[in-house]
Amino acid sequence: MSSEKLYSPLKVGAITAANRIFMAPLTRLRSIEPGDIPTPLMAEYYRQRASAGLIISEATQISAQAKGYAGAPGIHSPEQIAAWKKITAGVHAENGHMAVQLWHTGRISHASLQPGGQAPVAPSALSAGTRTSLRDENGQAIRVETSMPRALELEEIPGIVNDFRQAIANAREAGFDLVELHSAHGYLLHQFLSPSSNHRTDQYGGSVENRARLVLEVVDAGIEEWGADRIGIRVSPIGTFQNTDNGPNEEADALYLIEQLGKRGIAYLHMSEPDWAGGEPYTDAFREKVRARFHGPIIGAGAYTVEKAETLIGKGLIDAVAFGRDWIANPDLVARLQRKAELNPQRAESFYGGGAEGYTDYPTL
């Protein structure tokens, strides 16, 4: 297949992306604290990358409780919304499109980041056994062990759904084109999906129908708030991410969730594949089962090359590819790939925290 398909437009819910090379959500931890407020530097960073068919923002808190990393932005205060408005305006001025990725980090958090220094919340009081990021006195990211969470009470769960709903309303106000619900990588929605992190015995635990209940309630709240054509979702239903696996029936459970999402006609399904984290790549047989259940746009992300993306788009198994670190180092990634130009080297030491260095200073062609 010619690579022209990668550079052809794609209807994604309410928008039409100019190409199929999307910018994956990338946590960079450069927001202002206190307040978790996006900065003018972040506006410049995203504006530089507006040639992506769709920019998916870094993961963004739906509430103060949802915070898990020092320096990650929120979208639950007037100051945050006002700052995001400037960011989306800059992307739109360059004819780009932008979704905001909404998350609640759940147990991947630290008590020092939580309101009142409380324990983070989770489906069950089970440690994530992983690390998160705080800031040192110089504002640099430092890695620390996550705190032991407490289990959400049943009566608290509608409040989580409502926090997502309000964040979706705020995203609309802030000028985003779409939202992406973060239901992957071991964060709260994924914690409910996973039988290893969800030991509940009420209607949110046990069967796959119960474990998927929260994420589907959040999706339905988003559809009610803004319409199915504005709601995307990211899932990582195969493999293990941050010590959160998908249980012994991961494929069947994945297909149940994807079928339910497909029935709702949402804007897109973003599949975070396990091979970027050392897992096995998806088989075409599994991809075909996903496609049979979800007829809207499917975005692939993971250990992708241009060749892999072209092949899978050609087979009709995905519709777009989301690159991550390549976008960090190459603000003009689409032009570079189209011209087969050399890519800038990545500077991993500046991925998280800091200022303009390693953020807005990568050269273009």
Swiss-Prot record:
Active site: Y187
Keyword field contains Calcium: no
Gene ablation phenotype (knockout): Mutant is still able to grow and use TNT as the sole nitrogen source. Deletion of the gene increases the HOCl sensitivity. Mutant shows no defect in survival of methylglyoxal stress.
InterPro entries: Aldolase_TIM (IPR013785), OxRdtase_FMN_N (IPR001155), Oye-like (IPR045247)
Top EC category: oxidoreductase
A GO BP annotation: nitroglycerin metabolic process
Key words, A-Z: Flavoprotein, FMN, NADP, Oxidoreductase
A molecular-function term among this protein's GO annotations: N-ethylmaleimide reductase activity
Source taxon at top rank: Bacteria
Enzyme Commission no: 1.3.1.-
UniProt KW Lipid biosynthesis keyword: no
Signals that turn on the gene: Repressed by NemR. Induced by N-ethylmaleimide and reactive electrophilic species (RES) such as quinones, glyoxals and methylglyoxal. Up-regulated by HOCl.
General function of this protein: Involved in the degradation of toxic compounds. Can use a variety of substrates, including the nitrate ester explosives glycerol trinitrate (GTN) and pentaerythritol tetranitrate (PETN), chromate and various electrophiles such as quinones. Involved in resistance to hypochlorous acid (HOCl), which is the active component of household bleach and a powerful antimicrobial during the innate immune response. Catalyzes the reduction of N-ethylmaleimide (NEM) to N-ethylsuccinimide. Together with NfsA and NfsB, can use the nitroaromatic explosive 2,4,6-trinitrotoluene (TNT).
This protein's name: N-ethylmaleimide reductase
